[in-house]
Amino acid sequence: MIRSTLPLFALALAISAPVLATELVPVPQFRSVELRGGGDVAVVPGPVERVTILEGSTQFTHMYVENDGQLRIDACNERCPRNYQLRIQIQSPRVPNLAVSGGGQITTMGGFAPEGHLAVAVNGGGKIDARSVDASEVSAAVNGGGELLVRPRQSLAAAVNGGGNVRYWGHPSVSMAVRGGGNVTAGY
């Protein structure tokens, strides 16, 4: 009896185990990125746009580019296992505009050339840390909770609706609108 249940136990363990192999995801050119439903995305400088799943799988995570040039990352489909972990690395010659919806985190890494403008947004929870981006102007919006961390050189246009935080570093001119709670504050 022990012999017959052992393969079933091993199969159940294998099905529930996280997928750890890296996977290069072919996607067409994009101008912006939206992470939906959780996960961690690192945006790093590179010679071409490239998306790599470091932890997770395209079995459960769907990525596609909309007509407007937005790379959408749907973290978990209906077959997603419990405790599914998603980590993605996006390489790009320029920093794309960034958005998180329904949880998750996007972090930019240093080494990008200075940008003229960067737009970042969080809707329904999540975090974007773009402090490593040297952008002249930043547009930042939080709706329904979340946090944005940015470093604009000249100007910041920030909006918070229904809770959330926009924190900025440097000494930009700041225009802000806060409705229903939230903060736009200098970082330290």
Each model region followed by its residue ranges:
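Intrinsically disordered, low-complexity terminal regions
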Residues: M1-Y188
